[in-house]
Amino acid sequence: YYRSKWAQLDLKSANQLLDDMGLVKRDSRGIRLLPDGKPLNLIIETAGESTEQTDILELIHDSWLKIGIKIYSKPSQRNVFRNRIFSGETAISIWSGIENGLASANSSPAEFAPTTQQLLQWPKWGQHFETGGKAGQNPNDPFAMELLKLYRDWRAEPIFAKRKDIWEKVLDIHTEQVYSIGLIAGVLQPVVVSNNLKNVPIKGIYNWNPGAHFGIYSPDTFWFKTLPTNSMER
């Protein structure tokens, strides 16, 4: 449910949503016009570290153009990218997404609430939480405030079943409010392994936190059937 809620390609509904917002006028290119008469151009900023994100944006560009939105990708460097977001100069950005690909009731839901400045959809709110109110901005969105409350409730709750209930409420809010737009999930990660290296699983979950990529499969139990000929060890 959470993964597929807004994942369907429905240009008719997307156009209707934009019409309902009052963005009915278009220029000669078919790009919708904002209330001030300017075309609806979106500059999506990236950290410029990989062509994967710009390739994805090229695919999105063609779909969004059909509903009257023109997007441009703007690569930069990570420190510049983050500082622009932290200072509120960025309209929209693209990033790698949620770290926790193995969420359970006992996993922290911190990534789904404004708990840190590093969460790029709400840096000022996250900074406010991180600094105990000394910097940033106090959330003025009731749903974001509820997410923070649920996060605190989860931290104080020792019972697994109640933690699970809290997680479901967090995901319900996060899904309905769409604080970030999910693009891809469950991408296959090919891994090349020597036939000489044994005890490596054929299939697995490739996730950094939790999981540490290969760490979850105890790489200390991997072993070479024969010693590589170019090994310095004898």
Labelled PLM ranges:
Residues 39-49, 71-73:
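Short, well-ordered beta-strand elements
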Residues 1, 11-16, 52-62, 82-234:
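Detector for C-terminal structural segments
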Residues 73-83:
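Short helix-initiation/N-cap motifs at beta->coil->alpha
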Residues 46-48, 75-77, 185-187:
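A mature extracytoplasmic/lumenal domain signature
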